[in-house]
């Protein structure tokens, strides 16, 4: 058997048996075999966590732990920990097991809970203590040792959910994501986090009651600094011990699944923390990072970029994705900072980067890595979704790899977010001059499969909270928030909302304290806002017109996109059932319009089914309680006209009444409209 591979931009045919020779090992054990090592060094072992790191096993009739580590340029490696009083001992020296940098040792009689690190002697004579890159649990910060874990299994009861997930077409399903930071959603007190187990009691119930379909956890990989929010990782396989243990997180996810709530994990495969105990210069030389200093150094975030072309790094990262999918039943990955991975010149000035072999700024190995990641997940984990946080106009992010795409399922629509936030920050007087801020996103809407995000990044660093971005006094801010959200839920694309926005928290998000839940109890308007979001979420979930044809051009139609003078937008959302559609009338000024004509596509009886101006939401109560009757006559290029009342700073949603065996005359007789 032979393989064809690219080497120095030339095709080279090399027999597999010769390539395997350098990975050969004489070490006999139950944890890995030569095929495992071969695939690992080829960048195609997607379950490397099954043999890398620390694994309880029996060898020569002795129970203990086998440790396996990749450190290609280390001189010597010792395992140190509680069991050795943190001293290097000859009997705890790892053996180099092949030519390509794998080291391993079996140590008998080790027990769960023991803390350990690798003492790595470097070629220059220096030594450093490193946590286990594949370690699955760690000390609570500021301590940094890895911890042996054996009993990590739970009794899952989410088989029904997993079966449903595998059969679901998520492009034609409702996806409404609640993004949250576990350490600051709720707390016991100012200095004590809720544990995974404590969260499993209250979080699923809250998410279900509010009508969200998914939660998205900000990174739960181990990280030393709370203020990094989890985005500067030292332990990719180690779930953060801030909130409890491995079984606790599994129980939390299981509890969410039992309530039919999907779980998405924020994941950072592009760059890593430079703290000494982590992956940084692991064996004294660039190991997980690029060899070239300019390429490795991420000055913007003070981190190092992964060398995504290195096979062992690819095995490490793709296996990490499957570790959370397989072991924790994660339903999706939101891949952070994809733009940083795709572009060689991302965050770099002229002269600070080197073009690729074709003279471009594309990071070719990163592109290949992303494609392989998405292909692998689609192949081996049907129903698990991947989401790109990608902020540029890179094409085909959500197209299949076989057609030249990156293979993501969804992409955050950062353009929509920026334009619509800028619009809603304007005084309504000036909105007519920026009318296209809300219409332009539809010009490129079908270029990708978008998610509309209002994320944590928009409510920090002086940007103000979502409610505080809105223009006007207290009442108008809340009215504007309701209108903006209803417009968002009517716009094509799946939805994402950061915690705290759902009740109008005025202060920016702070990772060191819990949300201002007291607002709901103390202030009637915030309680009403909270109820509004609950109703809006369920309205979205229960009406297929709002999600079934998100990525089909037939799912959206403008009725009036050009009324800039009144800052009114009117559009239709459709479903596969041609008789079902919803008409959205969005008014972004505080003016009420009576006897306002809109065009509708069909003759019939219409009804207002949702109105953000309801008194129960804190609005002025300009609602329509009865039936409305269209009449023949062109309006907005539609054959029929409907006369309505348009509430101030609000969104109204209408539908045509379809009732079997009921004529229009009968509906007229029963009409109670006043």
Curated annotation (Swiss-Prot):
InterPro entries with a match to the protein in the record: A-amylase/branching_C, Branching_enzy, GlgB, GlgB_N_E_set_prok, Glyco_hydro_13_cat_dom, Glyco_hydro_13_N, Glyco_hydro_b, Glycoside_hydrolase_SF
SMART domains referenced in this protein's UniProt entry, alphabetically: Aamy (SM00642)
A Gene Ontology BP annotation from the UniProt entry: glycogen biosynthetic process
The keyword Ubl conjugation belongs to this UniProt entry's keyword annotation: no
Keywords: Carbohydrate metabolism, Glycogen biosynthesis, Glycogen metabolism, Glycosyltransferase, Transferase
PANTHER family noted in UniProt: 1,4-ALPHA-GLUCAN-BRANCHING ENZYME
Record text on subunit structure and interactions: Monomer.
Name this polypeptide is given: 1,4-alpha-glucan branching enzyme GlgB 1
């Amino acid at each position: 058997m032979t393989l064809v591979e690219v080497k120095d931009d030339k095709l080279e045919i090399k027999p597999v048996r010769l390539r395997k020779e350098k990975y050969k090992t004489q070490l006999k054990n139950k944890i890995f075999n030569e095929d495992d090592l071969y695939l690992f060094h080829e960048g195609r072992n997607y379950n490397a966590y099954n043999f890398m790191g620390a694994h309880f096993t029996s060898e020569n009739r002795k129970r203990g732990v086998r440790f396996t580590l990749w450190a290609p340029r280390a001189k010597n490696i010792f395992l140190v920990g509680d069991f050795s009083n943190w001293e290097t001992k000859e009997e705890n020296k790892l053996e180099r097991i092949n030519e390509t940098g794998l080291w391993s040792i079996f140590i008998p009689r080790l027990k769960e809970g023991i803390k350990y690190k690798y003492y790595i002697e470097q070629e220059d004579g220096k030594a450093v203590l490193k946590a286990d890159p594949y370690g699955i649990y760690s000390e609570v910060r500021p301590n940094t040792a890895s911890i042996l874990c054996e009993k990590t299994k739970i009794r899952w009861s989410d088989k029904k959910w997993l079966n449903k997930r595998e059969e679901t077409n998520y492009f034609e399903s409702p996806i409404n994501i609640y993004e949250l930071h576990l350490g600051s959603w709720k707390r016991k007190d100012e200095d004590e986090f809720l544990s995974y187990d404590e969260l499993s009691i209250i979080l699923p119930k809250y998410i279900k009651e509010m009508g969200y379909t998914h939660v998205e956890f900000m990174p739960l990989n181990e990280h030393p600094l709370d203020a990094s929010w989890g985005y500067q990782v030292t332990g990719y396989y180690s779930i953060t011990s801030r909130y409890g243990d491995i079984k606790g997180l599994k129980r939390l996810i299981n509890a969410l699944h039992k309530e039919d709530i999907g779980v998405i994990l924020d994941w950072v495969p592009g760059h890593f923390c430079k703290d000494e105990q982590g992956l940084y210069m692991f064996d004294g030389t660039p190991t997980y990072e690029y060899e070239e200093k300019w390429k490795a150094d991420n000055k913007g975030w003070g981190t190092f970029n992964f060398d995504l072309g290195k096979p062992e790094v690819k095995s490490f990262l793709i296996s990490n994705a499957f570790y959370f999918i397989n072991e924790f039943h994660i339903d999706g990955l939101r891949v952070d900072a994809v733009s940083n991975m795709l572009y060689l010149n991302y965050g770099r000035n002229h002269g600070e980067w080197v073009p690729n072999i074709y003279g471009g700024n594309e990071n070719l190995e990163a592109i290949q890595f992303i494609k392989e990641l998405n292909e692998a997940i689609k192949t081996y984990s049907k129903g698990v979704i991947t989401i790109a946080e990608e902020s540029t106009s890179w094409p085909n992010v959500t197209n299949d790899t076989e057609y030249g795409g990156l293979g993501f399922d969804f992409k955050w629509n950062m353009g929509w977010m920026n334009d619509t936030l800028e619009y809603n920050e304007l005084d309504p007087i000036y909105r007519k001059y920026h009318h296209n801020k809300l219409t332009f996103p539809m010009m490129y809407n079908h270029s990708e499969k978008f998610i509309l995000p209002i994320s944590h990044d928009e409510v920090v660093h002086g940007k103000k909270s979502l409610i505080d971005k809105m223009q006007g006094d207290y009442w108008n801010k809340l009215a504007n928030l309701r209108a903006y959200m209803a417009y968002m839920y009517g716009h094509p694309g799946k939805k994402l909302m950061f915690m705290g926005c759902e009740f109008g928290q005025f202060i920016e998000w702070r990772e060191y304290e819990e949300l201002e839940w007291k607002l709901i109890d103390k202030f009637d308007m915030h309680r009403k806002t909270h109820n509004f979001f609950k109703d809006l979420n369920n309205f979205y979930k229960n009406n297929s017109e709002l999600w079934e044809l998100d990525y089909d051009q037939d799912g959206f139609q403008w009725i009036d996109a050009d009324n800039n003078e009144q800052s009114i937008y009117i559009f239709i959302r459709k479903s596969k059932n041609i008789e079902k559609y919803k008409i959205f009338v969005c008014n972004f000024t505080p003016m009420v319009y009576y006897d306002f004509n809109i065009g509708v596509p069909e003759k019939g009886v219409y009804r207002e089914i949702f109105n953000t101006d309801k008194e129960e939401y804190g609005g002025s109560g300009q609602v329509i309680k009865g039936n409305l009757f269209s009449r023949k006559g062109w309006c907005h290029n539609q054959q029929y006209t409907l006369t309505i009342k348009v509430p101030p700073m609000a969104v109204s949603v209408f539908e045509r009444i379809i009732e079997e065996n009921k004529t229009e005359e009968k509906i007229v007789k029963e009409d109670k409209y006043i």
